[in-house]
């Protein structure tokens, strides 16, 4: 009887396992780390020991969360350049892609890795980890630590996966109907030339990344670990799962293999109380508030004077108040209805019911926050996936795109008035918000579940498709197509020569010897 009670009691006891988790995030883009940071913090809250190497350390220490600053490593020289500079690099999807490759190649070099003391020390660490979490956006340099620790790893990407990321997961990314994230091609039906350029982009992206970025980083891999270790290309194909910032309300609908986990909105927390001055400014606005922010990389103060003045003119003509994230000390010509600050709690501002409009560059984190709260958006895309994000809002009736080159006082004013005064935009944004929130689990709970799943199942290799290990010509069925063409051509040739020989034979039977059919020569009389 005692034994029976013991079994009954133990059946209600849940055993919690604590894992050692390593995170390495040297890529210096705050929104990129902001996408995955909530997962890392949540894992620490659940009792796991989390060690993170990142360029944005927190001001206060968290339990179970050990943070090492790598902000001095791999610094991008172009960070916070003038907006006009970014515009020139993003003239086309191809120029955006090449610019991204150039910057990545320039920064993630062996000499910069050698200068990064925290990561060099990590290469010599004897600590045992159960899992690596890292970002593989443009660089795969952090996969060095898979060779070091021989552990399963999870990667994240702050947008829809690039072709090289989909390829390593064996995930289909068909350019015939899935537009690349640097383009503004329609989601529903691309034209012939859209599909042509889209296909060329996919080929260049995949080939360029493997030939340029991976080739450079492979030298670093071989330098530290020797020539006998697995290549970064092969390591990348061992990715357990990839957490992607994608959702069908904001991105093209794409097929996903089990290892591709969409967690768009993972960074969206419950809104916190606003600073008193901002809350007072919003609450006292009879006609509502417009929030204007160009993200963490693009600084509003770098707007050319004529662009800045266009917004100042438009803002001075509307009854709404304006919150403008302005990084400079003084905003010249600021009207009384404008409040500026170098930093603003964007997520909490967008959650306020008196915020009527969000003017943004179209970054995916800010766009998803606006969608979550049902706030219409005017998007001014500058580079990267921003144009695609705004096009998605436009297609859903929840926003409009404002081309940077079209900015003028009258154009900005007309767009603001239309999106605020026409109720269809607010209603479309509300419907989009409902669809965006309608999920079986929260994005954060989803990410936590799959992270622990990978550890429990030793890397979860059963989630991989056979496509991961297939040569490209087999994956594209080129060998099968070539064989079928060979069979078809062979059959056609057999039929052709069979008919030809048969006809010749029949002619011989009907008309006698074929030589008798030839015309006879006239004998010339002498």
Swiss-Prot record:
UniProt keyword terms in alphabetical order: Endoplasmic reticulum, Glycoprotein, Glycosyltransferase, Membrane, Microsome, Transferase, Transmembrane, Transmembrane helix
Membrane topology per record: Single-pass type I membrane protein
Organism superkingdom: Eukaryota
InterPro entries tied to this protein: UDP-glycosyltransferase, UDP_glucos_trans, UDP_glycos_trans_CS
Subcellular localization, as worded in the UniProt entry: Microsome membrane
Record-stated family: Belongs to the UDP-glycosyltransferase family.
Protein's recorded name: UDP-glycosyltransferase UGT5
Lineage of origin: Eukaryota, Metazoa, Ecdysozoa, Arthropoda, Hexapoda
Gene: UGT5
